[in-house]
Design a protein with these regions (language model features):
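Nucleotide-sugar donor-binding catalytic core of glycosyltransferases
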Residues: 2-222, 233-250, 271-298
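Short alpha-helix at the nucleotide-sugar/activated-sugar donor binding site of glycosyltransferases
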Residues: 228
């Protein structure tokens, strides 16, 4: 699988947008964890860079998966030909769903689950996560690694002996991530680390209480959903996407600005995290949780 990037201007910033070559050859799901391709695999109909469908075939309560980049085309040529009420999911994209897209909502859409929902959710549209990196990239979404580390954690009594992990690719979102590194590099609370393999990263992640999760390509980061599997609290900067997830119950420690970090002790962070104390971390990274939420919207 070859993956390329192009620069895209969005809300005053340049962001990396992925372009893939041969995207339809290998599209496995990531169950028991959540990922875009797990969601795609569950859908009754798919409209993305690999395939389309006959709109007249959509029946009541069917699930239609649309690649977010193609929403304009989908609503212009496909949605209007669908006669039944259905559930829409948009995913597998670096593009956000903004308030402008609500113009597409009508009575045929029972509910819309949108990745990178950049306005407050409501009874008609709600967020769905990026989840783990899609397994097809054969890099950070290797399910075997997550399962092996989870099994190891259950028997490791030294879990959570470390404090705050800082480990990410600065160049994924340089304007957001580079300043964060500069702010914490001289603070002993933060372990700035690089890893030689995904397994090593996950194994170490499972020992930390917190992890810094700056935005990746447009608002969100796979790192959030990786950390929840191991009951590690993601520290994120406030934005609408993160707030939507927090309001849904996802355990996040949201701060207004990264500059606040150096004014907080570890005990301060632990106290702030009391808001998440009784939450089930892992479930928000599982396919089971999101599948049940989607199914609950059927008529």
């Amino acid at each position: 699988m070859k993956k390329y990037f192009k620069k895209s201007w969005y809300k005053g910033k340049y962001r990396n947008i992925s372009i893939e070559k041969y995207p339809g050859l290998y599209r496995p799901g990531s169950s028991p964890y959540f990922s875009g391709d797990t969601l795609r695999k569950y859908a009754d109909f798919i409209f993305d860079e690999t395939q389309s469908f006959k709109p007249r075939n959509v029946k009541k309560n069917n699930i239609v998966f649309v690649k977010t980049d193609l929403l304009e085309i989908y609503f212009s040529y496909y949605h209007k030909k669908i006669d039944s009420e259905y559930i829409l999911v948009s995913h597998n994209s670096d593009s956000a769903v903004t308030k402008a897209e609500t113009k597409f909502l009508d009575d045929k859409i029972i509910h819309w689950f949108a990745m990178k929902l950049d306005f407050p959710s409501n009874e008609k549209i709600s967020p769905i996560p990026s989840g783990l990196e899609n397994k097809r990239f054969l890099t950070n979404g290797k399910i075997k690694n997550f399962k092996e580390v989870e099994k190891k954690v259950r028997t490791d009594f030294e879990k959570y002996d470390k404090k705050i992990l800082c480990s990410f690719n600065v160049h994924t979102n340089f304007n957001e991530r580079k300043p964060l590194i500069e702010k914490v590099k001289n603070n002993n609370l933060y372990d700035i680390r690089k890893f030689t393999s995904n397994y090593e990263y996950l194994s170490e992640l499972s020992k930390y209480k917190f992890i810094l999760c700056p935005e990746g390509n447009n608002f969100e980061s796979h790192r959030i959903w990786e950390s929840l599997i191991f009951n590690c609290t993601p520290i994120v900067r406030s934005n609408t996407v993160n707030t939507n997830f927090f309001n849904l119950g996802v355990p996040l420690l949201i701060i207004d600005d990264w500059s606040y970090l150096n004014g907080l002790t570890f005990d301060d962070l632990v106290n702030l995290n009391q808001i998440n104390i009784n939450k089930e971390y892992r479930k928000f990274s599982t396919w089971k949780y999101w599948k049940e939420l989607i199914d609950s919207k059927t008529l």
